[in-house]
């Protein structure tokens, strides 16, 4: 996923997601991703649920931390850049952590501090809309680690979901967290990631 964005692109795009976030799309991630995911979950056995209770905390002080299943392993995508990524042993179900830096936007520290979260999320939103890989892309808002986040939700043509959280933590850093995979896996991971993200490992 390309995350290098120019400041001009951010500023030009900022209005579109503001409009999007004020629409009824706010509820779509609950009604679309969650309902698809919950449908799959209703057929899961109790032994499978027990397995998901065994977790690990992964990440770094730079990128933040999340809780994921203990069986997941660290890996690096070819185009992953400096992301921290973990998967379930396949290239389908993946969690990604990163933090946006001023140099990625070609701006100064003071310009970075003045950015709005919606400017960054809008650029991601529009790039996904233009991609031929996705059949549906929409924006919403949610909470991750206690922070309000703009969320870019995507459904790939192969049925795989991609959920991207963009938010500003209390240390002034713009954070990037993404979760991709199939509904039966996301049903456990989505709330786990949203509830567990933290910028310091406890």
Regions picked out by a protein language model, each given a short descriptive name:
Residues 6, 23-69:
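N-terminal, intrinsically disordered, polar/charged segments of Gram-positive cell-envelope systems
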Residues 50-57, 80-83, 143-153:
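Short, hydrophobic/aromatic-rich segments at coil-to-beta transitions
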Residues 65-114:
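Secretory pathway targeting signatures of secreted, lumenal, and periplasmic proteins
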Residues 70-71, 89-92, 145-147, 167-175:
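Short, solvent-exposed coil/turn segments at beta-strand boundaries
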Residues 72, 173-202:
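Surface-exposed amphipathic alpha-helical segments
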